């Protein structure tokens, strides 16, 4: 009998195997009706990696011919909180144009925000106890979620405030419902996830004299050649005809069509924190531009500022403590839940390498959106990735596992080529 020979896998064979396994996992998830569909994309700084794959369908509802229309690279998607990166870019463009400053008092453009009081609790009769804010709110606070604002659905005080009738449920899809809740702390005191980018959007509009849609078309879409990005979906019948539906996972794991208001009505105004619709390919153009520092959106120095940790040691600890005690929210998406994180201008910064050199590196910037959208830019490796589903709720275990498989497969490509 001939002696056995151990075959040592090469980096190339390992990378090919990881990509094959990843693609098989996505296809299996579609076949088993665990997800309706997804698009995954990756681009590298040097152009060696240019990967795009589309899986499954953009809806669980069959068309008149009993077909499930496919998910494609230009399928219009609801970005939800992935909009926040775009609004951050627009705010920084205003800074570059000399219209605003990161550290000036926003009172000049947002007196309604500056005058807002802080909710501290309720008295024995159930009346809200309010106090004046201490300190000034800066644009930097809005871009880093340190202004003292919180989303009403995330904070117990605001939930009680709403339950007592202080905040009425909006009858229309209007931005004022997002801007109405009072602050729950002073600026610069803690990291709280809230309607900061919606307020930043209002600041941009007042600084420029145009709405966010017009500013975005001129300053993001035109430079990058994007034609399918909008806050105003109902005014784009070409996009409406091809858009993805929203899908929701039931408690038993099955999928159902979600007739979301977002797809039937435009907001009364542009939501800087969650209002954009666009195709995956167009969003990747934004990520790629930032990664390459090509100057089409922002100057090199401004982009580098986005990747600098913006929170001091005390604020960073508070942010990490909050994130570690709310794993159900999982702001970091694919990030391991106990790793050290900071916040830059636009997203969460990983303050250490993930899985040695096999995954994201220290200094990578990431965020996402409620329908399990995850983007990340890794300047150390020179790689940006995008994973898009249109499936809720956020932090879905199946989507999260598939996202990690995809990212690690792309990083295996980087190791193979270096």
UniProtKB/Swiss-Prot annotation:
The molecular function GO annotations come to: acyltransferase activity; hydrolase activity
Application in biotech and industry reads: Compactin (also known as mevastatin or ML-236B) and the intermediary metabolites Ml-236C and ML-236A are inhibitors of HMG-CoA reductase involved in cholesterogenesis. Their hypocholesterolemic activity might be useful for lowering cholesterol levels in the blood and reduce artherosclerosis and coronary heart disease.
Which ranges does the record mark as transmembrane?
Answer: none
Q: Which Pfam families match?
A: Beta-lactamase
Does Hydrolase appear among the keywords? yes
Which residues are catalytic?
81
Reading the lineage from the top rank, the first entry is Eukaryota
**What EC number(s) has UniProt assigned to this enzyme?**
2.3.1.-
Pathway participation: Polyketide biosynthesis
Catalytic reaction equation(s): ML-236A carboxylate + (S)-2-methylbutanoyl-[2-methylbutanoate polyketide synthase] = mevinic carboxylate + holo-[2-methylbutanoate polyketide synthase]
InterPro entries per UniProt = Beta-lactam-related, Beta-lactam/transpept-like, Diverse_Enzym_Activities
The record's keywords, sorted A to Z, are: Acyltransferase, Hydrolase, Transferase
Name what induces it: Expression is induced at the beginning of the stationary phase, which is consistent with the timing of compactin production. Expression is controlled by the ML-236B/compactin cluster transcription regulator mlcR.
Residues annotated to bind 2-methylbutanoate: 370
Q: Where, in this chain's numbering, is monacolin J bound? A: 78, 178, 193, 262
Q: Which family does it belong to?
A: Belongs to the class-A beta-lactamase family.
Give the protein's function.
Compactin diketide synthase; part of the gene cluster that mediates the biosynthesis of compactin, also known as mevastatin or ML-236B, and which acts as a potent competitive inhibitor of HMG-CoA reductase. Compactin biosynthesis is performed in two stages. The first stage is catalyzed by the nonaketide synthase mlcA, which belongs to type I polyketide synthases and catalyzes the iterative nine-step formation of the polyketide.
State the PANTHER family in the record. Answer: (LOVD), PUTATIVE (AFU_ORTHOLOGUE AFUA_5G00920)-RELATED, BETA-LACTAMASE-RELATED
Instruction: Write the protein's name.
Output: ML-236A carboxylate methylbutanoyltransferase mlcH
What is the source species? Penicillium citrinum
